[in-house]
Regions:
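Small-residue-rich hydrophobic transmembrane alpha-helices
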Residues: 48-108, 145-164, 272-335, 368-390
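Short runs within selected transmembrane alpha-helices of multi-pass transporters and secretion channels
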Residues: 69, 137-156, 164-172, 193-208, ...
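Hydrophobic transmembrane alpha-helices of multi-pass small-molecule transporters
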Residues: 60-63, 175-179, 205-209, 281-284, ...
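Transmembrane helical elements of multi-pass membrane transporters/channels
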Residues: 16-35, 137, 148, 171, ...
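Short alpha-helical transmembrane segments in multi-pass integral membrane proteins
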Residues: 1-18, 76-141, 185-241, 297-364, ...
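Residue-level hotspots within pore-lining transmembrane alpha-helices
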Residues: 27, 31, 61, 65, ...
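N-terminal transmembrane alpha-helices
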Residues: 5-42, 56-71, 75, 100-107, ...
């Protein structure tokens, strides 16, 4: 159900929007964790390392697609906030066209070059074949991933965070069942995990399309709505492609870290894989608050209600920082138990490395919390330059950790890549936000 975020108490709106978004993101991570958990417990640590070593490459390609679809939803959210419902439909159609064209290119390039990328990353010979098999399946399903991400972002742009949640929960259950069936019963190995993910995404995308057609008139396209002017296409590309490249720039930094981990051996790769899966789950509250601010700021920017944006940012910072501190403490206390859940007993070397990961990462979640809020708020008002610059800062910081610190301090040196990247990205985003706010308040920019 569509929700107007340009009126009402900002704190209540932000909280009510974030909760289903957070639950949805939790299930999205369960999607990913199911593959990792079932692979690690049924096939073994070697297979776990194979799937884990693909994470940064998947982030590079799928992250580009996800960033693009999130950017495509911003002009639509601004038009929805301005009550321009004809413009909403035109925006939706243009977003579909850009997504289809991008999916074709990404599928072709990723399937052609994924083996070469694995070799460039110095993926250990013991796991490279398994990693390649998994990637081919995942990249073959880029269309389904992009379709679901576009439609779920479009739902959120009109203030509906609940509908994509319902479909995602069903898809997550389907993914886990298929994981068990394909891996444990049919013995399909890491490829089975990939097929389970792709089929579940297809289900989610189809469910979203059916729901839009039956329940959401503002998104139901007729022949008259199939209008794609050059100006409209340029506007969507101006916002969406910088966000897509920003995601890929960040992903290149994670690839640099993965190369460093690969050189440290399968034990380090397995420890980082398990720890990062937990980490991705832990940061979801902070990320969800940030994503909420993209929709909230976009709608209010379209409605020219700027004071509501500033108030929303202040309220969101309070909530997000609280979660960051609490989650960081919990992970530092219980990380050994959580790591063992992935690798089982008898791998204490992996568990110890996982503990070190959270010692460096869990204590710095406050940086990430602020980063998400400032980044998504700026993106919501159409300011994409600084978030892209911040992505470059993340790349630089991660590269320094991978090339220099990992050689000096081993696994610990590689784990400080995230805190360094978060801080390096947060600073320019914070400065840009307050410059933008000052310009708007003084009438320099509207």
């Amino acid at each position: 159900m569509a929700k107007d975020m340009t009126s009402g108490k900002p704190l209540k709106l932000i909280w009510n929007f974030t909760i289903p978004l957070l639950i949805g993101n939790l299930f999205q991570q369960l999607y990913n964790m199911a593959d990792t958990f079932i692979v690690g417990r049924t096939i073994g640590v070697q297979a776990l390392a194979a799937v884990g070593s693909t994470g940064s490459i998947v982030f590079l390609i799928i992250g580009f697609a996800t960033g693009l679809t999130a950017g495509l939803a911003i002009p639509l959210a601004q038009r929805f906030g301005a009550k321009d419902y004809k413009g909403v439909k035109h925006s939706f159609y243009v977003s579909i066209l850009i997504s289809i064209a991008t999916a074709i290119v990404l599928t072709a390039l990723s399937m052609i070059f994924c083996r070469k990328i694995l070799e460039i990353m110095q993926t250990p010979s013991e796991i490279i074949d398994g990693a390649y098999d998994y990637l081919i399946v995942i990249f073959g399903g880029i269309f389904s991933s992009m379709a679901y991400n576009l439609l779920s972002n479009i739902f959120r742009s009109i203030g509906d965070a609940k509908t994509p949640l319902y479909f995602l929960v069903m898809a997550c259950v389907m993914n886990i069942v298929l994981d068990i069936l394909f891996i444990a019963v049919f013995g399909m190995g890491v490829e089975g995990a990939g097929y389970a993910t792709v089929l579940s995404q297809i289900f989610s995308a189809v469910a979203c399309v059916v729901y839009i057609w039956k329940k959401i008139p503002v998104l139901r396209l007729t022949k008259a709505d199939l209008v794609a002017t050059k100006q409209n296409i340029r506007e969507h590309c101006r916002i969406s492609f910088p966000m897509a490249f920003q995601a890929s720039i960040i992903a290149i930094g994670t690839i640099m870290v993965q190369i460093a981990l690969n050189q440290l051996g399968p034990t380090s790769v397995a420890a980082h894989t398990a720890a990062q899966k937990i980490d991705q789950l832990a940061i979801l509250p902070m990320m969800s608050f940030g994503v909420t601010m993209a929709t909230y700021s976009a709608q209010n920017y379209g409605a020219k209600k700027y004071d509501r944006i500033w108030l929303g940012v202040r309220e969101c910072i309070k909530l997000s920082l609280t979660f960051a501190i609490v989650v960081g403490i919990i992970l530092n206390l219980f990380s050994p138990i959580l790591i063992r859940a992935f690798v089982g007993e008898g791998h204490e070397d992996v568990v110890e490395l996982g503990r070190l990961f959270f010692l460096t990462n869990g204590t710095t979640y406050s940086f990430l919390s602020l980063l998400f809020i400032y980044r998504y708020t700026l993106q919501g008002v159409g300011k994409t330059f600084t978030p892209t610059l911040a992505g470059i800062m993340e790349l630089i910081m991660r590269s320094v950790a991978a090339v220099v610190l990992s050689n000096m301090y081993g696994f610990v040196g590689a784990t400080v890549a995230n805190p360094m990247a978060w801080f390096g990205s947060m600073v320019p985003l914070m400065i840009a936000y307050y410059i933008f706010k000052n310009k708007v308040q003084h009438g320099v920019e509207q």
